[in-house]
Amino acid sequence: MRETIQAHKGKTQIEMITGGAIWLTNVIVFALWYWEVDRGGPAARANARKTHPDFLFAQMSSPELVDKDWEPTFVDYLFLSFTNATAFSPTDVLPLTRWAKLTMMLQSAVSLSTVALVIARAVNILR
């Protein structure tokens, strides 16, 4: 009996680590998408080719609190992706365009599904 429980523990740990890796990949991939597509990508943002942003960062709402030439970097999009995947909703960055809203909705659905499937699988292994 003890060997069976130990075998299940090992399987469960592997499942949880794999699920965590999948979830982290989800966060990184969506961060890259947000970074690459917002206002035409990093090069277009640097050259101010597109005036209307797809995302409203808190720094844009309070320009007196940041440098006058502040632009979002990859870390800002990574934070957006992480908070969207954990809270399943916008936190301090608001989507302004339809594609941004749909992409954030897709990320939340993928994240929720991943977490639900990993938990369901772990519970099933323990039975």
Segments (PLM) and residue ranges:
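Generic alpha-helical structural element
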Residues: 18, 22, 26, 67, ...
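Pore domain of cation channels
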Residues: 72-127
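Long, highly hydrophobic alpha-helical transmembrane signal-anchor segments
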Residues: 1-39
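Helix-boundary and loop/linker segments of multi-pass membrane transporters
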Residues: 6-12, 69-71, 93-96
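Membrane-proximal soluble regions of multi-pass membrane proteins
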Residues: 36-93
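Generic, low-specificity signal for short hydrophobic/alpha-helical stretches with a mild N-terminal bias
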Residues: 2, 15, 60, 84-88, ...
